[in-house]
Structure formats: C-alpha cells, structure tokens
C-alpha cells in the first residue's frame, strides 16, 4: 500500500481498495486473480447503473422506522472482516439517525460460502452464521435479531490471515442463550429448509441487484435524487479515491449503490445531502 495513491490489491476471491487514511474494501465472489495494477474505472454505462433491488418488505430485518425516507439495504457476510467494520459504521449511523425516524437499516444475507472454480471456499462458516441470524429473528423476533447481530459482529474475529477460521461456531448457541434464545430450537431451525431457503433468497436477490461481494449496500430514497447529492457523490469519488463502479446513482435516480466498507464521514455526508 502506498500513501497518496489509490491502490488495488487483488487476491483469490478478495479485493481491497485502499487510500491514504481510510480503507474502502469489499470481498468479492469468485473474483478472478488479476495483476496488481490499477484498473481504469472511469467509464460507466447505463447498463451497469441499472439496479434491480427487491423491495423492502415486512419479511426483511429492519432496524428503525420502516417508513423512513432513507433506507440503507446492506448485503452482508457474517465472516467478512470488512462487513464487521461497516457494521460498526452502520451502528453509529443508526445511533445518530435512527431516533429521528429518518434512516432505517435493512440487513440481508449474502454468505460467501460457495466454492469458486478451483474449489476454494472463502468463508465456509458464513452460511451457518447467516442461518443463525435468520433463526434468531424467527425465534425471538426483530428486536432479538438486532441484539444478537450487534453482539455477534462485535465479538467475531471474522476471517483474516491471522484468524482464517473466523468465529468458533460453538460460540453461536452460547451467544444466543445469553440473549434468551432456546438453543435446542435454534439448532433445529438452523438445520431447517426454511432457514436455508431464506438465506438463499436473500443471496439471489443480491445477485439480481448486481452484488458481487460484501459488504454491498443500497441507499433507497423516497424521492428522486437531486443534483446536490449527485455532486456530493462525484466529489466523494475524488476525495476518497473510490472507483466509479463502487459508488454510483442508479439510472432512475432513486437508488445509490455503495460497495465496500465506506467510511462513516462519507455515509453521513450522503445522508445529509439527501435530507436537505
């Protein structure tokens, strides 16, 4: 990594976009290995800006006002280190904007537990961890889901070179029990077809929306996004040295796509520009 320069470091199944002070990173699905060269992301097409995002419904995991003018839909992998970073950012965002009812956080499952062409699995425990999250919601309701989700992302080491296995899976029922979830019922639910179907449905909805890695977020606004916000995004691309395909407005100007662990200051600025 070099200072004063945006670098792109590619690994099997992973990509890291880094700047001088803040890292914006995303773990990708089945990403081919590339040379460590900068990639020209200055060109974009209307096709790449079409976002087919599934509507937010009562079936989603929603924190905050379900009728909030701004909804941030995040596709997340529990084993993803950059999801852990962005989870902390979103927790702070909701502490700031949740009480006002102006921002809601929608969590969707996107476990990177599928083998690539060589058979390599990036996060082998992510599916199990995603099913646990779903089952906490099923057994304890939305409040327990968010209580568990917050504690899980705080305690998990996530998958890194130092902790390649991530969280010890034996910790899942222990954490669930601490928040009042019956562990026998949890185990039964996690092995159920319903849990598998829900996680798969979220994953497929992410694929349809153009998600190729985690964390991937979509900012939904209840109005057409105006030139002020579009100008803010253009400036943010330069300020944070972010490739255009990681932060852009949809063709219908109703959705903003954010790929990676975007810094809190950027997200706050985006929210403020929308609320003006």
PLM feature segments, named:
Residues 2-30, 75, 170-276:
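C-terminal cap of thioredoxin/glutaredoxin-like
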Residues 46, 116, 127, 135, ...:
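Functionally engaged cysteine thiol sites
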Residues 68, 73, 78, 84-177, ...:
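Structural alpha/beta surface segment adjacent to cysteine/selenocysteine redox centers
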């Amino acid at each position: 990594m070099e200072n004063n320069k945006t670098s792109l470091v590619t690994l099997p199944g992973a990509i890291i976009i880094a700047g001088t002070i803040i890292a914006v990173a995303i773990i990708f699905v089945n990403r081919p290995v590339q040379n460590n060269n900068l990639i020209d992301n200055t060109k974009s097409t209307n096709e790449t800006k079409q976002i087919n995002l599934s509507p937010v419904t009562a079936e989603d995991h929603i924190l905050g006002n379900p009728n909030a003018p701004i909804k941030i839909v995040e596709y997340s992998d529990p084993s993803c280190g950059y999801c852990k970073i962005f989870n902390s950012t979103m927790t702070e965002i909701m502490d700031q904007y949740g009480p006002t009812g102006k921002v809601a956080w929608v969590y969707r499952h996107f476990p990177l537990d599928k083998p690539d062409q060589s058979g390599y699995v990036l996060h082998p425990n992510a599916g199990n961890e995603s099913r646990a999250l779903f089952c906490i919601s099923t057994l304890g309701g939305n409040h327990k889901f968010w209580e568990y989700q917050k504690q899980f992302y705080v305690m998990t080491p996530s998958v890194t070179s130092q902790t390649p296995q991530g969280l010890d899976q034996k910790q899942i029922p222990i954490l669930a029990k601490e928040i009042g979830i019956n562990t026998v019922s949890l185990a039964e639910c996690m092995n159920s077809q319903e849990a598998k179907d829900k996680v798969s449905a979220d994953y497929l909805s992410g694929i349809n929306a153009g998600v190729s890695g985690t964390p991937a977020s979509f900012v939904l606004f209840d109005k057409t996004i105006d030139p002020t916000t579009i100008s803010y995004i253009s400036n943010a691309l330069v300020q944070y040295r972010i490739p255009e395909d990681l932060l852009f407005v949809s063709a219908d100007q109703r959705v903003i796509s954010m790929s990676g662990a975007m810094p809190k200051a950027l997200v706050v600025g985006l929210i403020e520009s929308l609320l003006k």
